[in-house]
Amino acid sequence: MIVLQTIAVAFAMFSAIPVPQFDWNEKNMRYAMCAFPLIGVVIGAAWCVCGAMPLPGLAKVAGSALIPVWITGGIHLDGYADTCDALSSYGDREKKLEILKDPHCGAFAVIRLCSYFLAYFALCTCVSFTPRVGVLWVLALVLERALSGLAVASFPMAKNTGLAHTFATAADKTVVRRVLAVLAAVLCVGMAALGGWALVLAALVVLWRYHAVSWKQFGGITGDLAGWFLQKAELWMLAALCACQWGGLL
């Protein structure tokens, strides 16, 4: 029962998929970050179904670009937008953290979101769907969430409030780190074996960048920064997927 509650907590928080509602408590939040990567499986499966369907080209590309947003409800894009606003302010650390709390969407957030969707759509037009590509992309979507959860359990927090702090505080960090580190390692090996070593490299570079930016600019991570990382990792892995296909590796 606790396992199902843990999965439900992860899906309720990080997706728009209807799930049974439970009161969050110490037990069902302890390993919620371990269930977070399962959302990547759902998104990847929907992406594969879209890619395999006999749809017109533009409809298929639009579906591929929008499926992650529909399933997650845009929670990570919200963090991406807020972080883009904060970084574009060039203010001090306190100013940036204050912008992250502001519910309004600034001009730079709008510009970055438009640029993000344009780039994502363009990259989707370059992907030729095959079963191998589908499996690789499912693994990529799971990997980015495993790395995101690992960061929440490992990186310092920028503040003592917010979503990331809530999950980090409730988590059994030792177990979460071990589970997600092993999962990430297995995924990296599997992706490399499928010819997707460039996707692994892209994800790890973005993770390194995430740590560097969060520490230097904010003094640690927040829920918004976690969303920023996930969206950046997804875009760069998609670019790497296109590069692998162009290079004849897939």
For the regions a language model picked out, list residue spans one by one.
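N-terminal beta-alpha supersecondary unit
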Residues: 9-12, 26-51, 165-169
